[in-house]
């Protein structure tokens, strides 16, 4: 009987060992796949094909709204390109805390002005995608800094920071402006991942030079947006996929996607925040904006634009969009 128990115990241990090995191999394989896909600089996470549209509960944008958005987008792009070619500008760079070089462009409206705006682009995007926002700030008398986010466009870096690493990079850009002008009054504007960045930064100990934040289409947390996209793109459950992703991302990219939460950070914000979102956003659901707004423990306001998709509020109703921003900034 004792011999039989030993055999059973041995078999059990072997079975457990096999399960552990399979789990480790699966975690390494699946985790690496999704890290490569989602946050590796050379990954193809920017090619978004929705396989489960039912997981994204948004209203369809009507044809008239689409026409308005496309026409305004075309006009804004042309005007912004003309603006960027005529205004004084210079290339600048900073070293991030982890040693990589970050690059950006400053557009100088008035060298003697204290008014500055830092404009941040979105996931796998470029400064050119948001240059029209810089143009509008410039028209209001702001000097403008538009950086390339880490692992995007002109900046170095192997892994996209999803806002969490970028909040530290943003501090470097803020410090650069303050070094140039110790009396600078700085506005932070971010779109999509850029919005997540400024919201995540809001909970940090920001210099008093930072006067306000504008977050357009920001997500609540890295975990939440990846969970939403895993369902939409692959029709996959959160567990165990994201858990495997989390483990590998911690090792390779050096940040925890569970810790990377804009929702938690805005609870500690002392900086006024304006939240903007389109009610037809099929990438970052509108409810995330509502949750962020409710959680923010600071002076705040929000603008929801009807029939606007992801970061398209500025094209759907440009006058409303910019009037709201500068009205908010005028009241802080």
Which sequence ranges carry the predicted segments?
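N-terminal membrane-anchoring alpha-helices
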Residues: 2-71
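N-terminal cap/lid segment of alpha/beta-hydrolase-fold proteins
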Residues: 70-112
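Short alpha-helix in the alpha/beta-hydrolase fold that links the catalytic acid
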Residues: 133, 262, 271, 285-294
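Conserved alpha/beta-hydrolase
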Residues: 134-156
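Alpha/beta-hydrolase active-site loop
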Residues: 160-181
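Hydrolase active-site cap/lid region
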Residues: 200-256
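Short beta-strand/loop motif that positions the catalytic acidic residue
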Residues: 268-270, 275-277, 281
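Catalytic histidine neighborhood in serine/cysteine hydrolases
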Residues: 293-311, 318
């Amino acid at each position: 009987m004792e011999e039989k128990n030993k055999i059973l115990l041995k078999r059990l241990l072997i079975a457990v060992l096999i399960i552990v090995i399979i789990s480790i191999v699966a975690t390494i394989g699946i985790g690496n796949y999704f890290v490569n896909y989602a946050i590796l600089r050379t990954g193809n996470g920017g090619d978004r094909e929705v396989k489960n549209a039912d997981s994204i509960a948004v209203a369809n944008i009507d044809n008239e709204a689409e026409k308005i958005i496309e026409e305004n987008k075309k006009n804004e792009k042309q005007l912004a390109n003309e603006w960027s070619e005529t205004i004084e500008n210079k290339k600048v760079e900073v070293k991030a805390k982890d040693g990589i070089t970050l690059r950006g462009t400053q557009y100088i409206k008035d060298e003697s002005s204290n008014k500055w705006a830092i404009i941040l682009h979105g996931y796998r995007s470029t400064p050119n995608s948001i240059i029209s926002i810089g143009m509008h700030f410039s028209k209001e008398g702001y000097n403008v800094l538009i950086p390339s986010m880490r692992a995007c466009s002109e900046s170095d870096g192997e892994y996209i920071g999803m806002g969490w690493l970028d909040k530290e990079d943003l501090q470097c850009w803020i410090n650069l402006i303050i070094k140039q002008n110790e009396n600078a009054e700085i506005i932070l504007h971010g779109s999509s991942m850029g919005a997540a960045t400024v919201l995540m930064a809001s909970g940090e100990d920001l210099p008093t030079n930072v006067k306000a934040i504008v977050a357009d289409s920001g997500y609540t947390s890295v975990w939440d947006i990846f969970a939403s996209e895993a369902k939409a793109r692959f029709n996959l459950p959160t567990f165990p996929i994201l858990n495997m992703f989390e483990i590998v991302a911690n090792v390779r990219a050096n940040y925890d996607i569970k810790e990377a939460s804009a929702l938690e950070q805005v609870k500690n914000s002392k900086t006024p925040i304006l939240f903007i979102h389109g009610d037809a956003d099929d990438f970052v659901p509108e409810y995330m904006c509502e949750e962020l707004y409710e959680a923010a423990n600071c002076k705040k306001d929000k603008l929801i634009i009807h029939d606007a998709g992801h970061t398209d509020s500025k094209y759907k109703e440009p006058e409303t969009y910019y009037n709201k921003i500068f009205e908010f900034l005028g009241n802080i």
